[in-house]
Amino acid sequence: MKHIYLLPLLMLTACAGSRLESEKSIMVCGTYTADGSHGVYSIVFDNGKLTVEDSVAANNPSYLALADDMSHIYAVREDGENSGVYTFDFDPATGHFGESRFAAEGNNPCHLAIVGDKIVTANYSGGSVSEFEIGANGIAWNGRTMAAFAGCGPDSVRQKTSHIHYTILTPDSTKLLATDLGADCIYGFAVKDGNITLQDTLQLAPGFGPRHLEFSPDGRFCYLIGELSGDVMTLRYEQGTLTPIATIECDSLHVKGSGDIHVSPDGKYVYASNRLAGDGIRTFAVNDDGTLRNVGYTPTPSHPRNFVISPQGNYLIAACKNDNVIVVYARDKATGKLTPTGERLSLSSPVCLKFVK
């Protein structure tokens, strides 16, 4: 009889262990500040519960990046000709902010990335990419325009000129990629010996409107969301070259509002957000060949501009700008399904979430 009950007991213990898996960390949140937000917030994330810990004043810090040692947080200032990059001292153990500094450069940067000892910004209105040096003290300074573009696309409203929306370093750290929503292309910059130089251009279908992209954990595939087409493209990455291999619909309403995209930590699922109508997050399962298949859709509050998956993959947290709320979803690792937990944190115009790891 002991052998009969041993397997169920082990299964019950394993299930209980899964339920008790703990995730406690600190998040930081960037915002738009026209409607009363203070700037950048630190938030305690405790097994799906959210509590504001601290904040620091900033003007439209709409995208954030963290130094490797988490001692500094960098944020764009998306403010027309007054744009640039903030550097905030930060204590990752407590979630408290210290001194802040500002370096001017760019026109409405909407994204930034750390590339070695530089910070690179994607300037939406300027149609350009800027770079800032990171000093020995961790402070961003000496900003300059690295490359400017003047392309266009078939959408007479959204694609009159180039709009650089996102920059990301490839997994092998040999290239920096920059999406141009206005000209339907991805620029590839060679990264070598501390220099970043334009190398090649991948032209996409007219009207695709490339916005954000993310690589699979193994670095073999890249997933690109088209804000204007409402599609997600799978690209193969090999020896510095991106090759499109498949496209799948993300926004069935075709309202030209697709937003953010992220891959689960295990690489089995891809999530992409839609805005402007039928707001929500599309769930895709990843096939063996890296292509995607649609397995679900989860409604969200209005305008999920940005979202993040928790480090252990148990939760997805969405920043819903127009409803001034951050919402938490439990994530089933086996099926990819998202389920609202009921946890909501009211915050004015949240638009960027990052975990402090």
Residue ranges and their predicted role:
Residues 32-34, 78-80, 124-126, 134, ...:
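Short loop/turn segments immediately following the C-termini of beta-strands
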Residues 36, 58-68, 105-116, 150-173, ...:
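Beta-rich, blade/repeat-based domains predominating
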Residues 43-48, 88-95, 132-141, 189-195, ...:
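Short loop/turn segments immediately following beta-strands, especially the blade-tip
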